[in-house]
Amino acid sequence: MKDYEKIKEFVNEKDNAITVNDFKDAKIKFYYINKLMEDNYIYKVRKGLYVKINSFEDEYFTIQSRYKKAIFSYNTALFFLNQTEVTPNMIDITIPNEYNVSTIDRERIRIHYTSRENIELGAIELKSPFGNNVKTYNLERTICDIVKNENKCGLDLEQKNKVIRNAFSNKEIDKSMIIEYAKRLKCEKKIRMIMEVFIW
């Protein structure tokens, strides 16, 4: 089956997770999707999401596939941005205030809320540890979130100070962007006080 061999090549070229839209875009019929499952080439994680056999499920990709407006934040953002050496025990996501996530696993996922106007503020796309594209906040937004909501960030005082100190010693960080974000997030005063301690 020449076509089937090409389809398997298509699957091999994809990252660990494959969505039903990936198959549709490639004009692959459901007959072949079912055959891939029968042949133990892929398995169905949930409706519309498949993972290649012998690969680990990408929990980060699965979360964002299920909750489209969720953006990784706080400790999880620090992890994606290589600002921490420890893989967080909890996954932090930020969602719009009105977004319904009643079915989410709250023992594994810590939920933070923001306004609909600010949900995309500082959002960027990076690769998960499994090679899939996921959305997370940049370092500037993450620092603002941690400073504004220090009691909800999952960091103790020593960890928080270390993160902030390392962030402001990073030459690539945009300090003017932090101020701009702080104004939008209503934490400008706290951010300026922090910057006075760690920069000047």
Task: Specify the residue positions occupied by each region the protein language model found.
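Short amphipathic alpha-helical interface segments
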Residues: 1-16
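Short amphipathic alpha-helical interaction segments
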Residues: 25-38
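Nucleic-acid-binding surface
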Residues: 20-22, 37, 45, 49-200
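Short acidic, hydrophobic short linear motifs in intrinsically disordered regions
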Residues: 14-26
